[in-house]
């Protein structure tokens, strides 16, 4: 399943906003039996480690057997936030 992160806004900065985005995705987009997630960062101008940490950690916690990959990560803000998350 592809999730267009840019649909949650182009400036994604706070932990509470990341949590709200995950809860919205879980309620309205994600099916319970998903096996793979592709997070598409097109349209995102600013991304902070706090926002993406909250979104991805909740995604991995709830769907722990699903694979998670990323696309359209050329934006420096997105690159650095994902790099920070992988530490």
Task: Give the location of each predicted region.
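Amphipathic alpha-helical interaction surfaces in cytosolic regulatory modules
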Residues: 12-35, 41-86
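Absolute protein N-terminus
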Residues: 1-2, 87
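Active-site loop/lid in soluble adenylation, ligation, and acyl-transfer enzymes
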Residues: 9
């Amino acid at each position: 399943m592809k999730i267009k992160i840019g649909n949650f806004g182009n400036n994604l900065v706070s932990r509470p906003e990341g949590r709200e985005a995950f809860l919205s995705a879980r309620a309205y987009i994600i099916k319970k039996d998903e096996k793979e997630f592709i997070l598409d960062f097109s349209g995102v101008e600013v991304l902070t480690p706090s926002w993406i940490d909250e979104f991805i950690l909740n995604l991995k916690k709830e769907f722990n057997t699903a694979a998670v990959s990323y696309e359209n990560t050329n934006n420096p803000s997105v690159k650095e936030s994902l790099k920070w998350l992988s530490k």
